[in-house]
From Swiss-Prot:
Keyword Transmembrane included in the entry's annotation: yes
Name used for this protein in its record: Potassium-transporting ATPase potassium-binding subunit
GO (cellular component) term, any one: plasma membrane
Subcellular location: Cell membrane
Keyword Lipoprotein listed: no
Length: 555
């Protein structure tokens, strides 16, 4: 029965992807019906804020994005620092320590949601609502806006206006869908209140303080926007965030909704729907391989315990919630790292070595399917690399969407693809070379190395999940992961927007018999191979020293 539920869940991922992709294309490209519904409200916003609806250059678009995001980081930083004297603080929680406030503000603006604090004890209701939830809408709206400009550039059209796209992302996508999802979560038992903690009497007569809050509205945008941060420290393992299997499936659907839809949006906007389908199917195959790998490993249990003759019918159950079980915990771990959300319904630090390797590889690749917007930019980056390599092998000038891929584009892509591993491996080396980093490790040996690399991989990929055995709420970890999150977020977005702007200016080369097609199964295979060879092999030495070595040791 459990496998039937898994198949149905995956079918739901597939079935909602195309309709959502079509809706996104209409929402941003202009639809009379949508303009009639949302247009008056958006024009009012533009009038109040002084936004002029004109086409920007890629530099203007990127500058607008960075300045708006930077302003939001500063505002939210001071909310965290001053929450102790601000209203809506029934638990009288004090202001955040400076480096933790720095880390948290960047974390949520970068759509990472790395949490070096416990949600219910670290933030007031005001900080949760005005700080955290506000950024949970603004962060994915930023990248959804940018990916639309990116696709327009690839299609040879004007990039558009960042503030217009940002507003449309909020009014036409995130606010309506999150609102409806929040109502469903309330119906499923997720609390939504501004009241403080309630005191309950336990069976043995003791008193217990049960924390609550505006959780349903928080969880809906947490998953839809690929944010992932928890209202509670236990994240989606907490019964108030994720009461049962229905809420669990809904959360996974929300996580996958926009990332899986964007290939279809892309196909429609560039006038090649088949190419969008090829990208979707290719990535789903990689996703499926990851799920099969982690599930097989978790169901086989811990090799060390198996050798003792301990029964493991349910697989490795350490760190997992009984109400979800091993299979759905494995699926959730695959989804949350494939879609770069970072929400967890099981503790990733307790996964088996190969089970923990899958989430780690998903984040290292950062492209299966990746987070809202940012992930799709990486998908196209790998697609262009695949075309470039194929062109070199047959001695032809590489072409993508009928436009020649030349030195300028490849230099930008080369720098972009190297920057991600540089952040991860460089900062991991720094942490391992100083006691400021190694003192946080709770496990010696191979697993300790994986803890460190996982933290920086999660930060660079804007995922936010962690091997929570790492004692990371220290100035060193707060500052270094904050820098990695910021650089990992904005560097690739800007460089790839420059690539799209460069391609926009090029004339379309007529298609000939020798043109390498990017909308067939051959390209899909080369695309997958490029992801594996260029992406995964970059990190292979580290994976050998971490989870693979740990697995062989346990064996």
């Amino acid at each position: 029965m459990i496998w039937v539920a898994v198949v149905i869940t995956m079918l739901l991922f597939i079935l909602v992807a195309k309709p959502t992709g079509i809706y996104l294309e209409k929402a941003f490209q202009g639809s009379k019906k949508l303009d009639k519904v949302f247009g008056p409200f958006e024009k009012l916003i533009f009038k109040i804020t002084g936004v002029k609806e004109y086409n920007q250059t890629w530099k203007q678009y990127a500058l607008s994005l960075v300045l708006l995001n930077g302003f939001m980081i500063v505002v939210v930083y001071f909310i965290f620092r001053l929450q102790g004297v601000l209203p809506l603080n029934p638990a009288h929680i004090e202001g955040m320590e400076p480096t933790l406030a720095f880390n948290t503000a960047i974390s949520f603006m970068a759509d990472t949601n790395l949490q070096h604090y416990s949600g219910e004890n670290g933030l007031s209701y005001l900080s949760q609502l005005i700080g955290i939830t506000f950024l949970m809408f603004a962060a994915p709206a930023t990248t959804l806006a940018l990916v639309m400009a990116f696709i327009r550039g690839l299609a040879g059209k004007e990039l558009g206006n960042f503030f217009v796209d940002f507003t449309r992302a909020l009014t036409r996508v995130f606010l309506p869908i999150a609102f409806m999802a929040a109502l469903v979560f309330v119906a499923l038992g997720v609390p939504q209140t501004l009241d403080g903690a309630v005191t309950a009497q336990t069976i043995d007569g003791a008193k217990q303080s049960i924390l609550r809050g505006p959780v349903a509205s928080f969880v809906s945008i947490k998953e839809l926007g690929n944010n992932g941060g928890g209202f509670f420290g236990a994240n989606s393992t907490h019964p108030f965030e994720n009461p049962g299997q229905m809420s669990n499936i809904l959360q996974m659907m929300l996580m996958m909704l926009l990332p899986t839809a964007l290939p279809f949006t892309y196909g429609r906007m560039v006038g090649n729907k088949k190419q969008g389908r090829i990208l979707f199917v290719s990535l789903f195959m990689v996703f499926l391989l990851g799920f099969i790998t982690i599930t097989t490993s978790e169901l086989n249990g811990n090799p060390a315990l198996n050798g003792m003759g301990i029964e493991h019918v349910q697989g490795s159950t350490e760190g997992k919630e009984v109400r979800f079980g091993t299979v759905f915990s494995s699926l959730y771990a695959t989804v949350t790292t494939a879609a770069e959300t970072g929400a967890v319904n099981t503790m990733h630090d307790t996964l088996t070595p190969i089970g923990g390797l899958v989430p780690l590889v998903n984040m290292m690749l950062n492209t299966v399917y990746g987070g809202v917007g940012a992930g799709f930019v990486n998908i196209i980056m790998y697609a262009i690399i695949a075309v470039f390599i194929s062109g070199l092998m047959v001695g032809r000038t590489p072409e993508f969407l009928g436009k020649k891929i030349e030195g300028k584009e490849m230099k930008l892509i080369a720098v972009t693809i190297l920057f991600h591993p540089l952040l991860i491996l460089g900062f991991s080396a720094l942490a391992l070379s100083t006691s400021l980093g190694t003192d946080a490790i709770s496990h010696s040996g191979f697993h300790g190395l994986t803890q460190v690399v996982y933290e920086y991989t999660s930060s660079a990929a804007n995922n936010g999940s962690g091997f929570e055995g790492l004692a990371d709420n220290t100035p060193f970890w707060n500052i270094t992961t904050g820098l990695v999150m910021f650089l990992g977020r904005y560097f690739s977005l800007i460089t790839m927007l420059a690539v799209a702007a460069s391609l926009k200016e090029k004339t379309v080369v007529p298609e000939t018999v020798g043109t390498f097609r990017t909308d067939n199964s051959l390209f899909g295979g080369i695309f997958i191979g490029t992801i594996v060879i260029v992406g995964a092999l970059t990190f292979f030495p580290m994976l050998v020293l971490g989870p693979i070595a740990e697995f062989l040791t346990l064996k």
